[in-house]
C-alpha cells in the first residue's frame, strides 16, 4: 500500500519521528517537507476531506490529536524546527528540492531558496492561525529574508519580501480587535 492510499494518521507520526531523528544536515529540508504534509492534511480534514477516526486512548497515545488546535500547535512546533535550520535552508536552491517541497506559483527567482519558501509558508500559517502574532513574528521573518537578499544580483526576491511585508501590514491593520 502506498502512502497516498494509507490514512495519514497511520503513517504521519512515524514519519515525524524519523524526520526528528534524521541527520542534522538535512533536518531543515525534512522539517519543511513535514510542515507541508501537515498543512496539506489539515486542509483536507478542515474542508471536508476524510477526517481521522477516533481511537481508544491506548491506540491514540502514539498519534497526534487531529483537532484543528492541535494540528496548529504541531505545525507551530515544526515551523520552529524549520526556523532553527534557517542557515542551512539559505543554501538550498528550490530547484534542487522541488520533489519534496512545493515552491508555490511564483517564478523561482522570487523565492529562490528553501529559506524563502519556509518564510512564505510561515507567514501564511501565522496569519491564518495566530493573528495576534502575525505582526511580531512576520516582521522578524521578513526582516531576515530581506537582509538575506539585499545583495542579490536581481531584486526579485527582495521585491517579493517587500510586497509580502506591505500585504501583511495591510491585513494586520484590518483585523478586528
Residue ranges and their predicted role:
Residues 1-177:
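Extracytoplasmic/secretory-pathway proteins
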